[in-house]
């Protein structure tokens, strides 16, 4: 029993809370709702009678009291000519990924409606500036943007609509719009490309028998100096045209278009893409000047170059649309990637030459043969220097070794003056105490008469590098820069 009472109480409180919330919402809606304007044709005779007879409001009421906005001017007669012009407030940059651009414009339309001719007793100016709320009471062209993706009106602080009614029945409407328009891009020459973006104004429901759009004579599109981050747009490059379309089953529909020519500025891509990738390619060539057996230095340099170029390609691919054709930037990046990869392949070929046993043995044989030839030349020199008894012939040509020897000549008189006639020509570091009387090096004995032990380790053997490996590096130093320079000449002559 207690449980059922608790449930009933909970349900009752929930209903009361829901009712209170609904009342609060309805009161907020009532406060936020604007007062609805009634057209003169919708007002009662009593309301119209309250307006002073000689006032401007009364003149407007007289014009619109029998006006039907559902019927176009000159019904069943000549088509209505609507003169169109546009003032561009701002022009957004083109988005390559979505292939569109955004503009903020004042759209102005002017047509003649004989039903709105001001009466002859109107003593004011030649035009009436009418409140925008009256715009819905008039007939208006059903203009829409054929290549529009999204659009919106502006209503801060009031609806951005300007309405004029002229004495002869001309109606001028100006409204502020922000529109995102599609612009199919041809990126074959990207980033040295020039794009042509259209804005098409078309009638939605009226055929050419009822309505025609006409560009205003003179400058139908007014464009202030606009600075875009990536493009240059000039007033002289704007083109106008007619794009009247035929739809099967309904007929021809009037359409006018304006074409904007936008030339891309290459500076950003020169500094952000071309210069860094060029430097990476040049960096990969440094490996040709590094010793062929220094794989610890050459391999990381080549891998770094290839990975950096691949990363640049991936980053740019994410910022551009997925198109099926090759862009100019793709050609550059692929070429740079191939040059970086080729430098890595070049070192692989050098390593093959370096580790080829036949080439290594052939190089060792060549070196041994050269040393043998040098040895024979040394012996001949020695024979010319020392005679058969060991007597020096020309002491300045004695081979002074590193072995330090003990003095054995007891006095200078032991020297044969006829043999050492040019002692004065000895080098400064030549110590006579280390040589015997005939200029031959002798061993130095310790106190026990044993030769002094030499603990010096023999130097490590030099790696044998085949001549073919060195020749490949030598050719690469000239071939790679020449090929890259040739590619640059062809590339820039085509795309610039």
From Swiss-Prot:
Glycans are attached at residues 54, 242. InterPro entries: Glycine_rcpt_B, GlyR_beta__ECD, GlyR_beta_TM, Neur_chan_lig-bd, Neur_chan_lig-bd_sf, Neur_channel, Neuro-gated_channel_TM_sf, Neuro_actylchol_rec. Its main location: membrane. It is a multi-pass membrane protein. Detected in spinal cord and brain stem (at protein level). Detected in spinal cord, cerebellum and brain cortex. It catalyses: chloride(in) = chloride(out). The chain crosses the membrane at residues 269-289, 295-315, 328-349, 472-495. This is Glycine receptor subunit beta.
């Amino acid at each position: 029993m207690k449980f059922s009472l608790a449930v009933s109480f909970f349900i009752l409180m929930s209903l009361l809370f829901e009712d209170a919330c609904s009342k609060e919402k309805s009161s907020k809606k009532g406060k936020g709702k604007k007062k609805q304007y009634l057209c003169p044709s919708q007002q009662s005779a009593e309301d119209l009678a309250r307006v002073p007879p000689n006032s401007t409001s009364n003149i407007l009421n007289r014009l619109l009291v029998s006006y039907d906005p559902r019927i176009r001017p000159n019904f069943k007669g000549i088509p209505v000519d609507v003169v169109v012009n546009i003032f561009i407030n701002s022009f957004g940059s083109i988005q390559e990924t979505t292939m569109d651009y955004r503009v903020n414009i004042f759209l102005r339309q002017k047509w003649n409606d004989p039903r709105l001719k001001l009466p002859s007793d109107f003593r004011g100016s030649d035009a009436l500036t009418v409140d925008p709320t009256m715009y819905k009471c008039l007939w208006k062209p059903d203009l829409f943007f054929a290549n529009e993706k999204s659009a919106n009106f502006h209503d801060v602080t009031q609806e951005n609509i300007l309405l004029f009614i002229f004495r002869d029945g001309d109606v001028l409407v100006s409204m502020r719009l922000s529109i995102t328009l599609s612009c199919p891009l041809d990126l074959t020459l990207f980033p040295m490309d020039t794009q042509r973006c259209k804005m098409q104004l078309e009638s939605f429901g009226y055929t050419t028998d009822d309505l025609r759009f006409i560009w205003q004579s003179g400058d139908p599109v007014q464009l202030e100096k606009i600075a875009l981050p990536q493009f240059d747009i000039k007033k002289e490059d704007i083109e106008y045209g007619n794009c009247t379309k035929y739809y099967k089953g309904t007929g021809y529909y009037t359409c006018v278009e304006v074409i904007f020519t936008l030339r891309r500025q290459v500076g950003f891509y020169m500094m952000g893409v071309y210069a860094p990738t060029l430097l990476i390619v040049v960096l990969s060539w440094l490996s040709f000047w590094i010793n062929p057996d220094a794989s610890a230095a050459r391999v990381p340099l080549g891998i770094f170059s290839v990975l950096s170029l691949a990363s640049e390609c991936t980053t740019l691919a994410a910022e551009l649309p997925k198109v099926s054709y090759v862009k100019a930037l793709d050609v550059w990046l692929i070429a740079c990637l191939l040059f970086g990869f080729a430098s890595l392949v070049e070192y692989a070929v050098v390593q093959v030459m370096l580790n080829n046993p036949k080439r290594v043995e052939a190089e060792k044989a060549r070196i041994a043969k050269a040393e043998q030839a040098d040895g024979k030349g040394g012996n001949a020199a020695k024979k010319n220097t020392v005679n058969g008894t060991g007597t020096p012939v020309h002491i300045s040509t004695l081979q002074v070794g590193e072995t330090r020897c003990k003095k054995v000549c007891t006095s200078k008189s032991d020297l044969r003056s006829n043999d050492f006639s040019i002692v004065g020509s000895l080098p400064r570091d030549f110590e006579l105490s280390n040589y015997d009387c005939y200029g031959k090096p002798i061993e130095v004995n310790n106190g026990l008469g044993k030769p002094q032990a030499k603990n010096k380790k023999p130097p490590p053997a030099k790696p044998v590098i085949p001549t073919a490996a060195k020749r490949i590096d030598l050719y690469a130093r000239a071939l790679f820069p020449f090929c890259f320079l040739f590619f640059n000449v062809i590339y820039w002559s085509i795309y610039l």
